[in-house]
Amino acid sequence: MTKEKANESPLACNLGAMTVKQRERHRTLGRELRESVAEIRELPEGFEFLLPSKAWAMAAEFVALERLCCPFVRFRLDLKEEGGPCRLTLTGREGVKEFLRLELGLTARLPL
């Protein structure tokens, strides 16, 4: 086993990594973000969510909390110029995409 593999966290949410207050906020943010999503794109290693520009701060706060319980997910928040939409990308190593598909309820295949 390589040193990198030995340091990988398991593909499982660790909600114990957050306080009760953080979990409540995480749940609220997740619900609000899901309601804000304009489009979901399936990527080879994960998913991309198109959000209105006003959702960037909410997305950033969500990522900060999500990283506590799911450190194996790679996050990218892209803010377009001129107040354009923002994109939240969730990707990761092998197995992360299927984990995200199940956790986010994306059971149907999306067009690549």
PLM region spans:
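Short, conserved charged micro-motifs
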Residues: 55-61, 95-100
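Short, compact, well-ordered microdomains
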Residues: 76, 80-104
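Amphipathic, hydrophobic secondary-structure cores in small proteins
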Residues: 51, 60-63, 67-79
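Generic recognition of long tandem-repeat/solenoid scaffolds
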Residues: 45-51, 88-90
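Long, contiguous secondary-structure blocks with strong helical propensity
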Residues: 51-52, 56, 109
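Long, contiguous binding/interaction regions
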Residues: 2-45, 72, 94-112
